[in-house]
């Protein structure tokens, strides 16, 4: 059974779609289950000004993508780097152990996008 918070993020996902002129874009796929998440973000004054996601996969994958975008909006890269899987799992009201990979996939995609922000000369947008 899923929590009310998780179901709300699944049924009413926030910050969906792509950003035009994104500062970073990252897309990851879980090769085991096939879940895919794509994040695009814009920075302003060292903070995430806008973030959007697209996800294809299980209920937790979509809910975690939605919750993550709310968690990181207007946060600095340093603040975001301190987020852990358990923080995202708590934000969706918990996940079954078998679904914790959904939270990790969203965080890994975000980490890849942040790597692009921190190393713009060496990183290339992923998933294009």
Spans of features found by a protein language model:
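C-terminal binding/interaction regions
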Residues: 2-20, 25-26, 49, 75-79, ...
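Short connector loops at helix/strand junctions that flank enzyme active sites
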Residues: 21, 34-36, 48, 63
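Short beta-strand elements
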Residues: 30, 35-45
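Short, thiol/selenol-centered motifs that function as redox-active sites or metal-ligating centers
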Residues: 33, 55-64, 102
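Short alpha-helix boundary/capping segments
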Residues: 52-60, 72, 98
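Alpha-helical support elements that line or immediately flank enzyme active sites
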Residues: 63-75
């Amino acid at each position: 059974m899923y929590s009310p918070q998780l179901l709300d993020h699944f049924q009413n996902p926030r910050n969906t779609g792509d950003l035009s002129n994104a500062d970073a874009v990252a897309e990851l796929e879980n090769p085991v289950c096939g879940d895919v998440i794509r994040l695009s973000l814009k920075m302003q004054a060292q903070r995430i000004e806008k973030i959007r996601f697209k996800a294809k996969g299980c209920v937790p994958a979509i809910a975690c993508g939605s919750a993550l975008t709310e968690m990181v909006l207007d946060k600095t890269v340093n603040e975001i780097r301190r987020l852990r899987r358990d923080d995202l799992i708590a934000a969706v009201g918990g996940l079954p152990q078998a679904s914790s990979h959904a939270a990790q996939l969203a965080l890994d995609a975000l980490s890849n996008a942040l790597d692009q922000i921190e190393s713009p000369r060496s990183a290339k947008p992923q998933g294009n």
